[in-house]
A protein has these predicted regions:
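Family-specific functional microsites
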Residues: 11-14, 170-292
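Short, surface-exposed acidic
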Residues: 62-71, 137-140, 262-270
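Non-catalytic, peripheral interaction segments enriched in hydrophobic/basic residues
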Residues: 1-114
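Flexible, low-complexity interdomain linkers flanking nucleic-acid-processing modules
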Residues: 90-201, 206
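Generic detection of long, well-ordered alpha-helical segments
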Residues: 18, 40-51, 140, 144, ...
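Active-site-proximal structural scaffolding
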Residues: 21, 50-51, 66, 75, ...
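Exposed alpha-helical structural elements
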Residues: 18, 49, 56, 68, ...
């Protein structure tokens, strides 16, 4: 993908994620959704196809593991799944139609579809989405609204619905339950200039429970979750134990795994410690692999 290539080859420093998401919108979303507001007979399988591509792109932007929970990208980055973006476009096209003169062809087609609609018609999609998002305004009321007022109203309702759905998924997913957040804003670590590109990637992996430790990939390690380094069966290899493992560490750190869900200062401190430990851990893993 052009977006991935450009963000990987450009030296963007601490602005990497800001620019990557701008490029996502400009080069990917606007391209793949060109004229999508007029699509009719749109089914779930159609939106899933381009959402899958978007999810691959988001994973590449944060260099995430392939099995990372999908909802995590949207909640951490505060970006909407593309089917909700499509809904916004469709409603704005409705506003456009309702502001045309009654004798214009586009308005005549709309009025005819309303009177003689069949399954899959564009007007049917609009009515279904009005009910879905709780948009009660009639055509005449929409026609009286300014573009800015109508867009602001529908964006708020669609975003609120999307956030509820994403958090409902996260609440029932063990890897995402800690990042449930109804305040739909990009997490501060993506924009805090203290965090390097790799710091952000490490913190994202920690917060989504995709760090390379046995408890995060239990199917891979069957029933043996003991630490690969200290070999103590009483020590399960999880994010907390990595900080305390006597083989990996010769000092005690004043951080704990839960700090990755704390405030931005706690997150920064935790990432610096994890970065040091994971660097040392990588060396030990290479030694183990060579000797096995």
């Amino acid at each position: 993908m052009r977006v991935t290539y450009q963000t990987l080859t450009l030296t963007l420093g601490s602005y990497h994620y800001d620019i990557a998401l701008v490029l996502r919108d400009a080069l990917f979303v606007n391209s793949i959704m060109s004229n999508s507001e007029v699509w009719h007979n749109v089914q779930l399988k159609h939106t899933q196809a381009f959402e899958k591509s978007d999810q691959i792109l988001l994973k590449s932007i944060v260099n995430a593991h392939a099995k990372t929970a999908t909802e995590a990208f949207y909640l951490e980055l505060a970006v909407l799944p593309l089917n909700y973006r499509l809904s916004v476009r469709r409603f704005m096209y409705l506003w456009h139609i309702l502001h045309r003169d009654g004798d214009e062809l586009i308005r005549k087609i709309y009025e005819a579809q309303k009177c003689l609609s069949v399954r899959g018609d564009w007007t049917e999609l609009v009515e279904a989405e009005k009910a879905k998002y709780g948009i009660s305004e009639s055509d005449s009321e929409i026609a009286e609204m300014s573009r800015e007022k109508f867009k602001s109203k529908i964006q708020k309702k669609i975003e609120a619905h999307a956030v509820r759905c994403l958090n409902n998924i996260a609440e029932n997913h063990s890897k995402s339950e800690q990042i449930v957040d109804y305040d739909f804003k990009r997490k501060a670590y993506f924009t805090d200039r203290r965090f390097s590109k790799t710091d952000v990637q490490l913190l994202f992996a920690l917060r989504t429970k995709m760090l390379d430790c046995k408890t995060n990939f239990q199917n891979q390690y069957a029933e043996d979750l003991s630490c690969r380094f200290c070999k103590d069966n009483g020590n399960i290899e999880d994010e907390d134990h990595i900080l305390r493992c006597t083989v990996l560490n010769n000092e005690k750190y004043d951080v704990k795994f839960s700090d990755v869900y704390g405030n931005i200062d706690q997150q920064y401190k935790a990432v610096q410690v994890y970065k040091t430990v994971m660097r040392r851990r990588k060396v030990y893993l290479e030694i183990i692999q060579k000797s096995s």
